[in-house]
Amino acid sequence: MYRKSFEGNHPLGRDRFADIVDKYGLKVRLKMRKPRTTDSTHGLSVFPNLIKEYIPLAPDRLWVSDITYMTIWTDAEHYSFCYLSLILDAYSEEIVGWCVGETLDAVYPIKALEMALCRIADVSKEDVNLIHHSDRGCQYASAKYVAILKEHGIRISMTEGGDPKDNAQAERINNTMKNELLRGMTFRNIDEVTQAVASAVRFYNEERPHMSIDMMTPKEAALCVGKITKRWTSFREIHIKENQSFCIIPENGLPLQPCPGLTSGLRPPVNPGQL
């Protein structure tokens, strides 16, 4: 490339050329591979999606969970991954459980779950009214994870396909964590990742206001009950509300009346205004 550009007017050896490229940062970094964090081909028991039309109206009614990867750079060219498990309260937007792990083993999501369970430690199993929603990854379908949820009276909900929108709120907190709270940070080991995540979670829960909870912080929203004014509403919630309003029958709507002449036995009501 050098010889073609300068036509050999300035002779340069291979090693000298490599030194110049290194000095001025001209090396092309290879595209980073992205690890797959969800394996839904495990053959373990899975559960139906319970939250398709569900909007929580109090804290600890719906937790959403997911796993994302974090990059660790050992030097300028070599990297590895660690994995962040997060559990978010869907009502207050509060991160209630998290754990950074070296592998995708279920032990790390379980640690995040155990952290979240401290919130309901004083609530009897009979009084728990909570849904845990996740993808169908082997970590969440593992026997131990499922057993812990059942032990605490928590209903289990899972996505029914590969569409990220089925777990959009969890996907969104992953994006916020990586591309906002930890943006521009470089990590050399898992301890640095853990410390940074701990600081980011504290800031997110206690200082960062959210338009989706009336510009409160998640810690403040966690003290509320009932509908919170939203200055920003997710597409999922808009869709649910539209479906619910579509299904509402007006008070003055006339019921279908029996009609012996039709196979169905029903006929549409007569609109009095047209008589």
Model regions and ranges:
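Basic, flexible linker segments flanking DNA-binding modules
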Residues: M1-P59, D163, T217-I228
